[in-house]
Amino acid sequence: MTVQGKKITVHDMTLRDGMHPKRHLMTLEQMKNIATGLDEAGVPLIEVTHGDGLGGSSVNYGFPAHSDEEYLGAVIPLMKQAKISALLLPGIGTVEHLHMAKDLGVHTIRVATHCTEADVSEQHITAARKLDMDTVGFLMMAHMASPEKLITQAKLMEGYGANCIYVTDSAGYMLPGDVKLRLEAVRAALRPETELGFHGHHNLAMGVANSVAAVEAGANRIDAAAAGLGAGAGNTPMEVFIAVCDRMGIETGVDVFKIQDVAEDRVVPIMDHIIRVDRDSLTLGYAGVYSSFLLFAKRAEKKYGVSARDILVEMGRRKMVGGQEDMIEDTAITMARERAGCAAA
C-alpha cells in the first residue's frame, strides 16, 4: 500500500502503558504536565488510566498514587484539542467503570482481551456503543494467534459493535513481516468502515518498523509513547515514529519538534529507570512474554534469587498471558526450590 499522503491517528500511551514502569505512581502534576505537552504537540488521542486499565488498582496489579477518577478528572478539563481514551480489561474493569469514564468526558474506550478470548468483551463493547463512545476492540498478545484466528476474533468484536479493532503486540515479539501478515488479513476481513489499529512494544527494537509495517498493511491508528515510556523496553517511541512518518509523507498532525521536547523535557525526567532494551526486556521480546511482566520478574529475582531472565524464559515456555501475574512469583518459587534441591543433591 502507498503511504504517501495517508492520514493516521496517533494514540498516546505515555499516561497508561507508561504507568507500568512508574509502578502506577505517577503524580497528578506529572500527568497534567505531560498531557498538556502532548495536547500542544498535536497528539489527537491520549490514554489515561492505571496501567492495567480502569479498575486496575489491586494487590495483583499494583496500587496507584491516585484513582482513575482523579487522573481523568485532572487531565480532561485541560485538553484543548486532544480527546482522552481509557483502557478496560473485562474481569478487571466493569460496566460501572465504563459509565464513570463516560461521565468524566472520556471519548474512546478500548476493551482489551487476550487474542483468543474476544467473546468476553461483548458486554463491555455493547455498553460502550450504547453510550455512543468511540469503541475499540483490543486483541492482546496477537503473536500467539494465526491470522485466521485473529480474523475470527476481530469479527466477533466488530459484531458486538466495535468501530475499530487493534492487533496488539503486547510482547514486542513480532517482526515487520509478522505484523503485515496479520494486519493485512484482518483488514481484508473487516468492513471497510471499521478502523484498524496497531499497538507495539520495543523489546526487539522493532516498535517503529512494526508500526510503519502496520500503516502499510492498512492500519490507520497507531499507538506510541513519548520517550517510549511503557512496559518492557517501552512502547513505540512516539518522537521517532513521528519523524519517520514525516520523512515518509504519512500525515499525523503531530509537530515533529514539539513531541521531541515533550519526550526530552517532560517524560525522561520522571523515569524511575531509563527505558531501554536491556537483557530482561530483550528476553520479553525474544520469548514472547507479556511486557508488563518485567517489573514483577525483577521483584521476584530480588526475593528468590532466580534471575529475571530465567523467570521470563520459563513464563514464555509456559505460554503465560496477561492476567497471570501471580504465576510469576509461583514460577520463581518453584525454580528456586528446584535449584536448591539440585544443590543439596
UniProtKB/Swiss-Prot annotation:
Q: Which family does it belong to?
A: Belongs to the 4-hydroxy-2-oxovalerate aldolase family.
Organism per entry: Leptothrix cholodnii (strain ATCC 51168 / LMG 8142 / SP-6) (Leptothrix discophora (strain SP-6))
List the InterPro entries hit by this protein, alphabetically: 2-IPM_HCS-like, 4OH_2_O-val_aldolase, Aldolase_TIM, DmpG_comm, DRE_TIM_HOA, PYR_CT
What are the GO BP annotations of this UniProt entry? catabolic process; L-leucine biosynthetic process
Q: What is this enzyme's class at the first EC digit? A: lyase
Q: Which protein, by its recorded name, is this?
A: 4-hydroxy-2-oxovalerate aldolase
Residues bound to Mn(2+) are D17, H199, H201
KW S-adenosyl-L-methionine (keyword) present: no
Protein's UniProt keywords contain Metal-binding:
yes
UniProt keyword annotations, A-Z = Aromatic hydrocarbons catabolism, Lyase, Manganese, Metal-binding
Q: Which NCBIfam families match?
A: 4OH_2_O_val_ald, PRK08195.1
Its EC number(s):
4.1.3.39
